[in-house]
């Protein structure tokens, strides 16, 4: 189950393009996308993603679900092997629903199921307010919330790390690729050279 595969970039589904072909003949990918009954922007994002399902052969077996705000049941309890989220945590933190999203993810997983997280990584010193403003979230905070709902951290990786990202950007993580929200166009090359954000990659388990 992939949470909000839009990734904030219309029509979304970058990671879905990896997951869907992999699971097409031996598994099922559930995409928990925006609620079509919410804002026009969210509804349009979902419609564009649904159109991709029709247009892209590897997407056609994807089952659609809803990740609404506040979060609702994603699918049947104790029914999926894995829940994945890519660069969404800062949005849920800003909306005030981060813990609830973790809880419905926990509920959806079978015992022994995996919760995988990729997120822009904040320095340990960042406050909640700094995380919300910058779009970066600290590993310690993610672990704290995950443990609170019942998850256990079992592994982390530096595969998505970027030591060039010092996290000190005027427009937060959105200053970097792929957004490049710049107040000074002369800084474009500087931020292209930095690349995308430094990211945590963590693996949790539902062990009971």
Descriptions of predicted regions:
Residues 20-24, 98-111:
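A short glycine-rich, Lys/Arg-flanked "PGG" loop and its adjoining helix->strand segment in the class I
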Residues 28-32, 112-120:
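Conserved beta-strand signature within the Rossmann-like core of class I S-adenosyl-L-methionine
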Residues 42-72:
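S-adenosyl-L-methionine
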Residues 69, 91-104:
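A short, conserved alpha-helix within the catalytic core of class I
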Residues 72-83:
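A short acidic, Gly/Pro-enriched loop at the edge of an enzyme's catalytic core
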Residues 84-88:
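A conserved beta-strand element that flanks and buttresses the S-adenosyl-L-methionine
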Residues 135-156:
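Short alpha-helix
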Residues 166-208:
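Core SAM-dependent methyltransferase catalytic element
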């Amino acid at each position: 189950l992939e949470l909000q595969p839009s990734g904030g970039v219309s029509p979304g589904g970058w990671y879905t393009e990896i997951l869907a072909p992999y699971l097409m003949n031996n598994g099922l990918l559930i995409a928990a996308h925006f609620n079509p009954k919410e804002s026009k922007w969210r509804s349009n994002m979902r419609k564009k993603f649904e159109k991709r399902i029709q247009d892209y052969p590897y997407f056609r077996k994807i089952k659609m679900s809803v990740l609404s705000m506040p979060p609702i049941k994603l699918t049947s309890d104790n029914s999926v092997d894995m829940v994945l989220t890519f660069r969404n945590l800062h949005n849920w933190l800003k909306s005030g629903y981060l813990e609830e999203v973790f809880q419905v993810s926990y509920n959806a997983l079978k015992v022994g199921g995996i919760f995988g997280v990729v997120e822009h990584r904040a320095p340990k010193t960042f406050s909640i307010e700094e995380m919300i403003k910058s779009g970066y979230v600290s590993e310690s905070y993610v672990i704290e919330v995950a443990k609170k709902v019942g998850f256990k951290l079992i592994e982390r990786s530096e595969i998505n790390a970027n030591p060039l990202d010092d996290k000190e950007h005027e427009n937060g993580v959105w200053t970097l690729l792929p957004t490049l929200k710049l107040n000074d166009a002369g800084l474009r090359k500087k931020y292209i050279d930095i690349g995308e954000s430094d990211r945590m990659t963590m693996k949790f388990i539902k062990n009971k």
